[in-house]
């Protein structure tokens, strides 16, 4: 049997929990529409980016949802045009269905805002601005439930749901023009009433998720992972305070979601310190890094931490830091997800500026960067087989094999081994 494959087991297979490697691809349809030219690592044209991501080893994708996006964001309280704020419910239904149809897991990121929601801004949707706190909570419940029902009907039922984006300081503070006590921020030092208002809102969001998508995992997402760059987070005190408040309020959730951008959050050891704390205090929760990224070229605007002596801004540097993050995360059994933010950005073949330099494609060449391969090593679809032997010679090929080791030219229905990973062909 000349095509019989004998597997060289170079790693131990373990029955660990499912791990997810993926990215937030919320802008992919825009780049496809703009005619972006995507290429593999070795320069072959990519006709379907989602298929390419899956073949590389990604098994989950994240998409953000705004309430009523108008391609606008705020800068110092003033509204400005933002091409990237376009993900309404119809957008997410279409992209979510594409993800599900590929056999990948779908993470939905509710922003509960008309524009970007992060620690610097969490604006209440304009249409909800006049509601009192009780009415706002009820609106949040009905909106969440209806959005999920529509996604299910469209074939885009989420497997994981973020009830808010980077909500370290709460959400739906009010309007950009509000000031003082009218802004319902939830800093560690904020009034207890602000925190009560916030947790009451969260309870309605999570209630709707459990009712409409009972099998989905609920994620609470924050970005207080740095002790050196975030002044209120010495010894991870702000991070600890947030999840303590969630526990005291009996918020129903499954996964702790973290952001980690080394150029904002500092060394890898700072992320690991946050994970260690969470593992000790919240052993019943899984942890995911739902946003991660690092440049392959120049510094990202607003960078506060220079890591370039260890990880230069280059393809090799981006690859190295990704590999080291994956290695660290794999040491922690409670960590089950790693998602690259905006991996699909690619100006090649378009009239886009190419300003963003931390995706997983090089805008100058359109080629996938080396970091993509490293990121995908976090996923748990690996068979534990890192290499194969044919007639005593190690091989690295793109062929498909049955579980008994038989090479097949055209895989049909069933489970196969491809690039050392199990792959289901439907």
Segments predicted by a language model, with ranges:
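C-terminal tail/sorting-segment detector
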Residues: 415-426
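Hydrophobic faces of well-ordered beta-strands that scaffold small-molecule active sites
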Residues: 20-25, 59-63, 106-110, 159-163, ...
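Residue-level detector of functionally pivotal "anchor" positions at catalytic/ligand-binding pockets or at interdomain
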Residues: 381-404
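Boundary/entry segment of secreted carbohydrate-active catalytic domains
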Residues: 18-52
